[in-house]
């Protein structure tokens, strides 16, 4: 999974230039045709987001806008819901299984949100649930009891037509953080700390290894102006990942 951080233009709710949209579309299309792109989404600014913080059995819910604080995903769930409140309800149940921690809900950008096509009647609301990393996930995963409870909840969400798909990530010790400054690249091998920048979007890719991922990120950075931060993480494909 390649994850890029939020930028000031997205945070301000400004539409990207059409030239950038076309260039990015060509870039993604090329790799999709080659069978490399499995999934991906961009997220709207923080005003459309909700942060849930769980402490000592209590949950604090904060709607955006807000700044990034503990931005290090351990997993994601793509939800299709009728309202933001419905997504918050599912996120509360998910978070209570895990105990102390933090979850973020972010609205997924649709084609009509970025001016590519007109919005349909009663458009779907897709929200990305971001399960933030903690000591347990960085050490190798949740407990067997937590995994079983999450699996049951995901089954319920799927039956309700809410859960579109989900994935979990391996610890940052197996990832890399790429920082581009004017197209100059600095690579930080994991483990690495949480970022203070909100997640702006992600792509799930099937690649030969980090060398190919870094090459793709170079082109991606050039399209976006040459200055940005990208985390490259390995998707956990073990059978007991939950």
Where are the language model's segments positioned?
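Conserved, structured core segments of small domains
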Residues: 1-242
